C-alpha cells in the first residue's frame, strides 16, 4: 500500500496540510515581514485602488505587487483578520508545491518511490516547512514558479499548456516583481537548448510568453500611470533590486558564494547528494542532451547564479528552486540505492512525516520551526492600545527601534508606533506638551522612568515585556471598558 501512487499523494497532501496549518490558531504573527504583509493584505480592499498596496493607510511603499494581498484579503473575508488567516494562503500554496513536486517527478521519471522522496526532501530539513507556516511571499512565489515550470515541460507534449505556463509566470511577477520572470528566462534558454529556434518560435510558446508579460506587467503599468517617476524610483531603484552592487563586489568578491555557504549550513543531510546530483544532471544535459536533465539543471542553476550576485542573499528567496532540488536529489539517490534499500526506507519516511504531524498538532513542544508563540505579550496589549487611542492617533515610542515592534503592533491594534525617543528628558518634555499621548516602552525602561520621575506617569497596561503608559494628568481619560467596543482579533 505504501508504494501506491494514490496513497502517497493523499498522504502527502493531508500530512502537509496538517503540518502547515497545525497549531496556527493561537500562534500569532511574526515581526517584521509577516506582520508587514498582513497589514497590506488587510488594507488592499479598502484602498482607493486594488492595484495600490498601502501600509497603515499610506502609499509611500511600492515594494510589493498586489496578488498575494488580494489572496490573503479574500481569506480575511472568510475567516476574519487574524494571524491564522494571514498564514493560510502560504500554507495552502505550500501543500500545492508538495503535490506539484511529487507529480512533476512522477511525470518525468515514472517512479513512485523517487517522487515520494522528492516531496520528502522538500519538506525536510525544515526550511520550506517553516516558511509555509509564515505569512510571507516566498512560498506563494515558489508555487507560481513551480506551476509555471510544470506547465512548460508539459507543453512539450501538449502545447496548450504553454498558455497556462505564461499565466503562472505572470502571476509570479504579480507576486514578487522581477523574481517572477525567472520561468520566462529559463523557458527561453531551455527551449533553445532543447529544440533550437524552432521551439522558441512556436506560436503557442510565444503566446504564453506574451500572456506572462501582459499579466505580470499590468501592475507596473497601472502604478506608473498613477504615480509616474515616484513609482519607478521607489520600486526599481531601491537597494534590494540591485544586482552586483559595487561596494560589495569591490570590498569582498567572495560574497557571491553567500548562497552556497547558506546551503552548506542549512541543507543537511541532502547537501552532498544535491551537489553531486546537480553535477550529474549537468553532465547528462551537455553530453546526453537529456531534456529532463536540461530542464531541471536550468531551473536550479539560472536563479541560483543570478541571485548569488544580488545585494540581499536570503535563502528563502531560492525556495522557487527547492522543488527542482528535491527531484534532483531524489533521482540521484534512487540511482545509488538497491530496490531492497528503497523498500526499507519508505516506511521510515512515512513514519517521520507522521511523527512531525503529531509533534505539530498534539504536543506543546516549542521549537524555532514556527512552533513558538509569537508576540503573545503584544497581542495581549493590543486591545488596550486600540481602545485608548483614536484611529488616526499614533503611539509614542521610548526604547524601541523604528520597525520593532511597529509592524506587529500595527497589525493587532491598528495603530502606528512613532519613531523612537532616545532619552528620558525628551520624553518628559513631550509628555508635558501632550499629556494625552500614550507611550510604549520596555518594562526596564519604564521602571527607570518611574524611579527618576515619580508621580509623573500612569501605567495603563503592563506585562513581562511591555509597559503602555501615559501622563498622570491623562488618567481620567483612560478606559478599560470594552462593552460595545469592537476590538481587533488578537489570535
Protein language model regions, located:
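Transmembrane-helix signature of polytopic, membrane-embedded enzymes
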Residues: 5-13, 101-124
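Short hydrophobic alpha-helices at membrane interfaces in multi-pass membrane enzymes
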Residues: 113-118, 154-170, 300
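Transmembrane-helix motifs of polytopic, lipid-linked glycan transferases
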Residues: 88-109, 147
Amino acid at each position: 500500500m505504501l508504494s501506491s501512487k494514490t496513497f502517497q499523494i493523499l498522504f502527502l497532501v493531508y500530512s502537509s496540510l496538517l503540518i502547515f496549518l497545525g497549531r496556527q490558531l493561537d500562534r500569532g504573527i511574526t515581526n517584521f515581514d509577516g506582520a508587514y504583509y498582513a497589514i497590506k493584505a488587510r488594507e488592499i480592499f479598502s484602498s482607493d485602488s486594488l492595484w495600490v498596496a498601502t501600509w497603515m493607510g499610506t502609499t509611500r511603499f511600492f515594494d510589493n505587487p498586489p496578488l498575494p494581498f488580494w489572496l490573503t484579503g479574500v481569506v480575511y473575508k472568510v475567516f476574519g483578520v487574524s494571524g491564522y488567516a494571514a498564514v493560510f494562503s502560504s500554507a495552502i500554496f505550500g501543500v500545492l508545491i508538495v503535490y506539484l513536486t511529487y507529480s512533476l517527478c512522477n511525470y518525468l521519471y515514472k517512479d513512485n518511490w523517487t517522487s515520494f522522496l522528492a516531496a520528502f526532501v522538500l519538506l525536510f530539513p525544515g526550511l520550506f516547512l517553516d516558511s509555509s507556516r509564515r505569512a510571507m511571499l516566498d512560498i506563494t512565489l515558489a508555487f507560481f514558479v513551480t506551476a509555471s515550470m510544470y506547465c512548460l515541460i508539459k507543453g512539450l507534449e501538449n502545447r496548450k499548456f504553454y498558455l497556462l505556463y505564461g499565466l503562472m509566470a505572470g502571476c509570479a511577477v504579480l507576486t514578487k516583481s522581477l523574481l517572477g520572470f525567472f520561468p520566462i528566462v529559463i523557458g527561453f534558454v531551455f527551449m533553445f537548448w532543447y529544440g533550437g529556434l524552432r521551439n522558441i518560435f512556436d506560436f503557442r510558446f510565444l503566446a504564453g510568453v506574451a500572456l506572462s508579460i501582459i499579466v505580470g506587467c499590468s501592475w507596473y503599468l497601472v502604478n506608473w500611470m498613477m504615480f509616474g517617476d515616484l513609482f519607478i524610483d521607489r520600486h526599481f531603484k531601491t537597494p534590494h533590486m540591485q544586482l552586483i552592487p559595487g561596494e560589495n563586489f569591490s570590498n569582498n568578491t567572495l560574497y557571491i558564494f553567500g548562497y552556497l555557504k547558506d546551503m552548506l549550513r542549512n541543507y543537511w543531510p541532502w547537501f552532498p547528494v544535491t551537489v553531486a546530483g546537480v553535477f550529474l544532471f549537468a553532465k547528462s544535459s551537455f553530453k546526453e542532451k537529456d531534456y529532463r536533465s536540461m530542464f531541471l539543471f536550468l531551473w536550479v542553476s539560472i536563479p541560483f547564479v543570478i541571485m548569488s550576485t544580488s545585494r540581499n542573499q536570503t535563502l528563502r528567496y531560492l525556495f522557487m528552486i527547492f522543488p527542482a532540488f528535491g527531484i534532483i536529489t531524489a533521482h540521484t539517490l534512487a540511482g545509488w540505492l538497491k530496490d531492497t534499500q528503497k523498500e526499507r526506507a519508505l516506511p521510515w519516511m512515512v513514519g517521520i512525516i507522521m511523527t512531525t504531524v503529531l509533534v505539530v498538532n498534539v504536543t506543546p513542544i516549542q521549537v524555532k520551526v514556527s512552533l513558538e508563540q509569537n508576540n503573545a505579550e503584544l497581542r495581549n496589549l493590543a486591545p488596550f492600545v486600540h481602545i485608548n487611542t483614536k484611529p488616526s492617533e499614533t503611539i509614542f515610542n521610548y526604547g524601541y527601534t523604528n520597525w520593532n515592534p511597529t509592524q506587529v503592533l500595527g497589525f493587532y491594534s491598528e495603530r502606528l508606533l512613532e519613531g523612537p525617543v532616545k532619552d528620558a528628558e525628551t520624553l518628559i518634555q513631550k509628555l508635558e506638551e501632550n499629556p494625552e499621548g500614550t507611550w510604549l516602552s520596555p518594562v526596564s525602561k519604564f521602571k527607570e522612568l518611574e524611579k527618576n520621575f515619580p508621580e509623573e506617569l500612569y501605567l495603563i497596561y503592563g506585562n513581562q515585556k511591555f509597559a503602555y503608559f501615559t501622563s498622570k494628568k491623562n488618567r481620567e481619560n483612560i478606559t478599560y471598558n470594552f462593552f460595545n467596543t469592537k476590538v481587533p482579533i488578537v489570535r
